[in-house]
C-alpha cells in the first residue's frame, strides 16, 4: 500500500504525523510528568522539534520545493528525532513504563516512516 503513495503525498503524511506527535509531546507528555516520568523541558523540546519538522511538509507545496530534497531532509530530521528520543530512554532514570511505551512507540512509527521515505527517495534518485 505505501509503495503506491506519491512522494508529495508522503511528505504531507509526514507533516500530519509530525503535527500529531508534537501535540502529543506538548499536551499529553508535557502536562503529565508524574504519569510518564518525563520532566520539562524535554517534552516541550521534542514537541517543538516535531512541529518545526511538520512545517517543512506543510509548506512543501507553497514553497515549490523539490520532493527529493524535502524527503532527504525529512529522513535526516526524523532520524535525528528518533536518536534524541532514544537518548531520552537511555538517560532518564525517572521515566515510567508509560513514558517508555510512548517513546518506544514514537521511535517505531517514525523509523517506519523513514524507511518508506528512503524507498521513495531512492525511487526518485534512480
Sequence positions of predicted segments:
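Small-residue-rich transmembrane alpha-helices that serve as helix-helix interface/gating elements
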Residues: 48, 99-116
Amino acid at each position: 500500500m505505501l509503495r503506491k503513495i506519491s512522494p508529495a503525498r508522503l511528505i504531507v503524511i509526514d507533516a500530519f504525523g509530525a503535527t500529531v506527535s508534537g501535540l502529543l509531546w506538548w499536551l499529553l507528555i508535557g502536562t503529565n510528568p508524574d504519569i510518564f516520568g518525563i520532566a520539562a523541558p524535554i517534552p516541550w523540546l521534542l514537541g517543538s522539534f516535531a512541529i518545526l519538522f511538520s512545517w517543512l511538509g506543510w509548506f512543501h507545496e507553497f514553497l515549490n520545493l523539490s520532493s527529493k530534497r524535502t524527503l532527504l531532509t525529512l529522513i535526516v530530521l526524523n532520524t535525528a528525532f528518533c536518536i534524541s528520543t532514544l537518548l531520552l530512554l537511555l538517560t532518564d532514570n525517572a521515566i515510567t513504563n508509560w513514558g517508555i511505551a510512548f517513546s518506544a512507540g514514537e521511535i517505531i512509527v517514525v523509523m517506519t516512516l523513514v524507511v518508506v521515505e528512503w524507498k521513495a527517495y531512492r525511487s526518485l534518485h534512480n
